[in-house]
């Protein structure tokens, strides 16, 4: 009997030793990173040609989640329907090349524009200084450093009518 109890105690201890609770694996969560731009005609380079008293403005939001970027933009007070919208590389006050084209359409009211969509590496059209293609990581690095802007173009202002620096 004593031997049986001892044997059961050894088995119980062995079972406890091998069934230690294991820590739960870490859950990988990627928090969304958000950037914004306040669009204003006074930020555009070169300055747009506007009617007296006109002051186009707008907003753009970019949300990074994994390997893609979702965006929303809205502009108002434009001289006409939008013809294009882009993300460019460029410091404040400097014009730069297009790196990502954005979808934009005329809004429901005259002089307004809206755009919404998502882009990934296939939507990146920019080139690095060495001529190689930019990656999404290159675009995000430029956005994080404050060296990108978004603008909306119209037929009256082909270089751009309203612009905002992209900031965190």
Language model features by range: what are they?
Residues 16-85, 89-168:
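Metal-centered catalytic cores of metalloenzymes
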Residues 1-4:
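Positively charged n-region of N-terminal signal peptides that target proteins for export
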Residues 6-15:
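Bacterial N-terminal signal peptides
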């Amino acid at each position: 009997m004593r031997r049986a109890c001892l044997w059961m105690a050894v088995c119980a201890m062995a079972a406890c030793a091998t069934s230690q609770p294991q820590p739960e694996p870490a859950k990988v969560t990627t928090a969304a990173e958000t950037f914004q731009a306040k669009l204003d005609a006074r930020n555009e380079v070169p300055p747009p040609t506007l009617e007296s008293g006109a002051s186009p403005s707008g907003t753009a939001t970019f949300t990074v989640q994994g390997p893609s970027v979702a965006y929303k933009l809205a502009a108002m007070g434009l001289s006409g329907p939008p013809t294009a919208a882009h993300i460019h590389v460029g410091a404040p006050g400097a014009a730069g090349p297009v790196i990502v084209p954005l979808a934009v359409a005329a809004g429901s009211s005259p002089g307004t524009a809206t755009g919404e969509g998502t882009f990934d590496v296939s939507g990146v059209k920019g080139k690095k200084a060495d001529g190689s293609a930019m990656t999404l990581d290159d675009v995000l690095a430029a956005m994080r450093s404050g060296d990108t802007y978004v603008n909306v173009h119209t037929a009256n202002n082909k270089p751009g009518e309203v612009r905002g620096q992209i900031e965190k």
